[in-house]
């Protein structure tokens, strides 16, 4: 599937580095942000962090300095001298903050959407219960196709793309 340029995990309490865990399947929340340019800029960064912190509170993952800690880890792991066009994923559970960086795949013009009958657990949150979605995505060329989750004859969302109507 994706080739990661960075994969690191940190203890949530102390921010000490620990063995990498992607946290998929855990009780937790993630966000994926587009990072681009030199110096690096993150599209809609404030919105991503605000939604992440709100969702973490709803999941009972509470730390007063969480926003500051996430920013510290992002700055620690990004180079000021590198030109970016990547996706930065930040995932958290009650014990671990996991960050990863992968190249952003540019979609082809002839893009297909494979419909899959599936409704995510608690779809109002970007939770880490994505195992079924990832199993579908791992068998596809993500530059040419994505999955559309359908339930009750309605398209709910996609695996990785944005839907615009």
Please tell me what each predicted stretch does.
Residues 1-76, 93-165:
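Helix-start/capping segments and mature chain N-termini
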Residues 78-86, 142:
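Short secondary-structure junctions
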Residues 84-96:
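Hydrophobic/aromatic-rich structural module bridging two neighboring secondary-structure elements via a short loop
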């Amino acid at each position: 599937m994706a080739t990661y340029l960075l994969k690191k995990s940190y203890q949530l309490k102390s921010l000490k580095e620990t063995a990498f865990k992607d946290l998929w399947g855990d009780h937790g929340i993630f966000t994926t942000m587009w990072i681009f340019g030199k110096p690096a800029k993150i599209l809609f960064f404030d919105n991503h962090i605000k939604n992440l912190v709100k969702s973490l509170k709803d999941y009972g993952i509470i730390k007063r300095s969480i926003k500051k800690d996430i920013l510290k880890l992002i700055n620690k792991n990004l180079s000021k001298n590198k030109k970016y066009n990547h996706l930065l994923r930040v995932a958290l559970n009650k014990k671990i903050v996991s960050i990863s960086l992968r190249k952003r795949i540019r979609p082809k013009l002839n893009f297909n959407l494979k419909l899959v009958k599936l409704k995510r657990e608690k779809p109002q949150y970007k939770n880490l219960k994505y195992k079924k979605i990832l199993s579908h995505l791992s068998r596809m060329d993500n530059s040419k196709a994505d999955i559309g989750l359908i339930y009750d004859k309605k398209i709910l969302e996609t695996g990785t793309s944005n839907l615009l109507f």
